[in-house]
Amino acid sequence: MTWTTPDLCDRFPEVAVAEPLFRHFGGRTTFSGPIATVRCVEDNSRIRELASTPGDGRVLVVDGQGSLRQALFGDQIGAQAVANGWAGVLIHGCVRDVEILAGLPLGVLALAACPRRTERRDLGDVDVPVNFAGVAFVPGHWLYADANGVVVAATPLSLEIAGVEH
């Protein structure tokens, strides 16, 4: 049985729902997994580092402070994330190389596209709680994303256990 974010919201009213700010850029529009976080401003050093580690089906949530001046994520980091088993990324900022990202088997949500890359200054924080789009994203909590939106829960959700019928 597959899930949708509307079904999750109906069955689990306690879930947090992100404000509808994000566009899909990846080859997968439906993805979920435990959250890992990065907080950075126009420096993707920590994103690159984390994407090169085993993802184990996690979702990388990046608080880029909503900057639209530089892209935090592109084809190279996207390819690393796929190779290392990440389920997807949610970026409060920009991506680039959108034609290539669209062909990757990876969920990619971001505010917009920007062709300018970041500078790498080795700055940023990993695995810290971040807040944007009206939601607290906590490492280890679960993110569910599809064409309807983004939902966050403290624990994994299962519609099969919940007995929801379609």
From Swiss-Prot:
Keywords: Lyase, Metal-binding. The keyword Metal-binding applies. One of its GO terms (biological process) is regulation of RNA metabolic process. The keyword Metal-binding applies. GO terms for molecular function: 4-hydroxy-4-methyl-2-oxoglutarate aldolase activity; metal ion binding; oxaloacetate decarboxylase activity; ribonuclease inhibitor activity. A divalent metal cation binds at D97. InterPro entries: RraA, RraA/RraA-like, RraA/RraA-like_sf. It holds the Pfam family RraA-like. Divalent metal cation. Substrate binds at G74, D75, Q76, I77, R96. It catalyses: 4-hydroxy-4-methyl-2-oxoglutarate = 2 pyruvate; oxaloacetate + H(+) = pyruvate + CO2. It is an enzyme of class 4 (lyase). Its EC number is 4.1.3.17, 4.1.1.112. Its cofactor is a divalent metal cation. Homotrimer. Catalyzes the aldol cleavage of 4-hydroxy-4-methyl-2-oxoglutarate (HMG) into 2 molecules of pyruvate. Also contains a secondary oxaloacetate (OAA) decarboxylase activity due to the common pyruvate enolate transition state formed following C-C bond cleavage in the retro-aldol and decarboxylation reactions. Belongs to the class II aldolase/RraA-like family. This is Putative 4-hydroxy-4-methyl-2-oxoglutarate aldolase. It comes from Xanthomonas campestris pv. campestris (strain ATCC 33913 / DSM 3586 / NCPPB 528 / LMG 568 / P 25).
